[in-house]
Every structure is written in structure tokens, then in C-alpha cells.
């Protein structure tokens, strides 16, 4: 769009990058990286810095006729990107030719720096809620097995819920509703069985039978609701289910490998691909200078899923809180030091 503007001088084209660049800041994490877990591209889940956006922010602030709040916002963002490159010891973005072409960009003096610190934005079409507060940022996602991500100054953790019945393996939110101080995520899934054939099939090979011709018996429906409330020091997460009894559920907190877990009973440095059921109390999570606390934990069963299609946390460590439905549990994830 910037190139189209340069060719036509039609200012309407600049409204698109202005909106897009502002939106991008709502995807920046507290450590300055970009949240990519909902990406549909090859960068999904990777740690990506916004270096390639430097010249776009600088261009829009100096040549794009952006005025007022967005102009200052874009200048601060451009400066923050360069400062971050210097702090990390990385190369500056490859845009010298643009500075040579556009005098305003080359002569611009960058003073203030930083991205938007606090925001709350529901991207309803994408099923994404992004919230940044003083001590942490979090992302709630519809349609993903990892439905909640929390970032504390670069320390990323996420939540999943294991539900192993019929074709269901995980809680996947079908509805995401923003509330005054958080959000609600809800999903329903049927327990079902095949009815007997009304007409004898043409084969005795199960895999060759047209199962779509069989009726289903649906005796129960499991409804799972996750309610998230924000606090200054972290999140309050309530898990509530109804409609099915004695189903083993697993609330899973996935943390980076190398995180130290500790409480009054144990001290453990985590390894990738491993996990633990914590049956009671709170547990501290320490990674570098950052410390979080999680709990109260619970462990009513040891079933961790043994069916095909079960996801594994091969790159991190998993804390399991296990309960039998119906479930009505509340846990807290708190920032103790960031």
C-alpha cells in the first residue's frame, strides 16, 4: 500500500498501513517480541522481533501524513525497534536505501521510545483477545487447543485442558466472549455411539463401511466453560463443567524447559517433554529473575491420556491439575517478580 501511494499519491492507500501498524502494536509482547501463536504462516510459535517494521513505522510517521497520536506512537515504535536491536547485539534492519531515498526519514530525530504498554482488544473475526497490563500480557484464543497464553517479560506459559472421550482430545473454545475484567471461553461436545445398521452393509470390513449411513445415539453433552478474571498481579482462572460425570479432565500449565518448580515439598529443574501431577497447594515457577506462582493445584486421578491424537508438550514441561467431572475449580497464576 505504501508503494501504491508512492506511485499514485492517493492518500487513501495510507489508511491501510496506518491501521495495520497500530494493530501490530497490539500483538507486541512485554519483551518486545511478536505474539505468533495464532499465525497461519511458517512463523507460528516462533520468537520473532519486529525489526522489519522499523522502516514502515518511520515512513508513516515522517512521510505518510499521519498526525497526532499515531504519529507519536509510530515514532516511539521505530525508536524502540532500533534500541532493541542494539541491546540484543543484532544487525539493524536492512533499509539504508530507503533512508537514502527519503530525506525526511534520514533527518528524523527519534526521542521517545516504546510500544503501547496497556491495551485490550478483541479481534472477533480472528477469535483472539489481546490484553496487556502493567505486570503481564495474555492472549485468549478461540479454536485452539492452547486457549490461553501468558507472557511475563518474555517468560511464556500456556494453558490446555485434556478431555479424552469419543473423538475429543482437548478443550477447544467454540465461543470467546470479552467481559469487563477478562473473558469467557465455552465449548460443548457430544458423547455418542453408533446405532445398529438399519440395512446390512455390503462388506464386513469395518474400514470399508459407510459409517455416515448409521444413526448416532447422543446420551450426554459435555459443556466446558473457562472464566478468566484479571487482577493486578495475575489471572484468576475458573474451570466449570456440566453434563457428564466421572470424565477425567486435565488442566495443563505448559512452562519452558529449564524452569525451576518449587514449593515446601520439592525443588525441581524441569526438562523438555516431562510433566508432573501436583495434588495440592501452590507451586512457584522461576526462570531467570522472573517468578510466578500457580495454584491451588489438585490431583484426583493419574490418567494423562493414552489415545491416538493426544498432543504432547515435547519442547516444554507440563504441570497437571487433574479432576473428575463435574468440575468447578479456580486457580490463580500470579506474578511475584518480573
Predicted regions and their residues:
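Beta-strand-rich recognition/accessory modules
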Residues: 286-338
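Inter-helical turn/loop segments and adjacent helix faces that build the functional surface
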Residues: 4-14
Amino acid at each position: 500500500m505504501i508503494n501504491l501511494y508512492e506511485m499514485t499519491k492517493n492518500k487513501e492507500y495510507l489508511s491501510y498501513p496506518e491501521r495495520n501498524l497500530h494493530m501490530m502494536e497490539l500483538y507486541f509482547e512485554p519483551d518486545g517480541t511478536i505474539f505468533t501463536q495464532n499465525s497461519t504462516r511458517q512463523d507460528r510459535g516462533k520468537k520473532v522481533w519486529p525489526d522489519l517494521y522499523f522502516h514502515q513505522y518511520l515512513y508513516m510517521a515522517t512521510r505518510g501524513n499521519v498526525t497526532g497520536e499515531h504519529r507519536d506512537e509510530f515514532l516511539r515504535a521505530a525508536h524502540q525497534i532500533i534500541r532493541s536491536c542494539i541491546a540484543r547485539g543484532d544487525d539493524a534492519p536492512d533499509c539504508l536505501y530507503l533512508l537514502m531515498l527519503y530525506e525526511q526519514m534520514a533527518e528524523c530525530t527519534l526521542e521517545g521510545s516504546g510500544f503501547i504498554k496497556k491495551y485490550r482488544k478483541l479481534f472477533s473475526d480472528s477469535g483472539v483477545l489481546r490484553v496487556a497490563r502493567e505486570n503481564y500480557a495474555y492472549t485468549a484464543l478461540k479454536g485452539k487447543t492452547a486457549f490461553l497464553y501468558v507472557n511475563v517479560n518474555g517468560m511464556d506459559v500456556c494453558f490446555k485442558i485434556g478431555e479424552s472421550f469419543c473423538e475429543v482430545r482437548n478443550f477447544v473454545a467454540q465461543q470467546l466472549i470479552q467481559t469487563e475484567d477478562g473473558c469467557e471461553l465455552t465449548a460443548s461436545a457430544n458423547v455418542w455411539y453408533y446405532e445398529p445398521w438399519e440395512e446390512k452393509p455390503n462388506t464386513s470390513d469395518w474400514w470399508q463401511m459407510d459409517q455416515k449411513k448409521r444413526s448416532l445415539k447422543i446420551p450426554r453433552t459435555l459443556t466446558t466453560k473457562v472464566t478468566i478474571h484479571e487482577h493486578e498481579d495475575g489471572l484468576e482462572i475458573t474451570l466449570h463443567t456440566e453434563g457428564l460425570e466421572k470424565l477425567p479432565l486435565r488442566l495443563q500449565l505448559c512452562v519452558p524447559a529449564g524452569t525451576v518448580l518449587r514449593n515446601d515439598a520439592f525443588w525441581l529443574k524441569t526438562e523438555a517433554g516431562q510433566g508432573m501431577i501436583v495434588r495440592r497447594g501452590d507451586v512457584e515457577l522461576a526462570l531467570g529473575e522472573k517468578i510466578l506462582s500457580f495454584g491451588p493445584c489438585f490431583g484426583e486421578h493419574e490418567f494423562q491420556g493414552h489415545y491416538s491424537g493426544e498432543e504432547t508438550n515435547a519442547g516444554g514441561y507440563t504441570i497437571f491439575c487433574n479432576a473428575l467431572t463435574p468440575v468447578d475449580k479456580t486457580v490463580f497464576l500470579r506474578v511475584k517478580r518480573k
